[in-house]
Amino acid sequence: MARGRRLKSYLDYENALGDGIGVGYGQSYQPWLRAQDVKSRGNRSIVFGLKTFRNHHLLSSVESNFFYLAEFNDSVIDIREQFPLFPLRLTQQIANHLHFQHPMVRGVRGVPVEVLNVMTTDFLLTLRTPEGGLRYKAIAVKHNESIPEREAQKLEIERMFWQLIDVEFQIYVGSELNNVVGKNICWATSVLRDGSEFYDKYPLDKILWKLKPDVYPIVGLRAMISSIFGVDAQEAMMLLQAMIGLKMINVDLSYPILETGLIKIISNDHW
């Protein structure tokens, strides 16, 4: 993993913005904080985005879970993680208004002036509306509903920041159900993230016609795909994952697929 970047002074902030960090959208966006820039806050990961075509830096298992849920949502067209809240004077004014201490940079030796820390929102989503327009939603990710007082203060600064610029703000709290759904999406889409599109050479309609809504054992589906296309078990499993990940098959993601060995097909492109 690459070395962490230094963001300890106002000059550092200016240089980062000049390098395009924290600005832009889609493939060009660079998160303000990367996995290597922060001390461990859980299971950090870097995941290639199927919609953005860039690496996403996710700082905890709950962030990863939310990312998979958001990416799988057809309305979401862009995901910007670790989004910086600029200008600093606005978050400072909000903190002063609320009589809260603004987050400060810590542990900088030889710096006589206190430096305001750049606050970030875990995710800024761009969504396509039913009418064809765009809207934005800011998401703060939390492990559970029990939030310490200081954390709640920072969340209130964050909420008011987005309110002032007319962007919806929401707190996402991890749950067992969402963890199961996210894990299933992660599994199904993992075969798509290298961009190889290996599935294109197979006439998948031959499979889809056979998959009426029902509950199927994975081993049976894998054997059927192997038989029809003459591929080994690993390739057959990858094709099954691709059909789910590409939403050719609509399956019930609310129970653990790999743990149960079962897939409940709700519908597909032909049924």
Residue ranges and their predicted role:
Residues 1-271:
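Electrostatic, structured charged patches in enzyme active sites and in nucleic-acid/phosphate-binding
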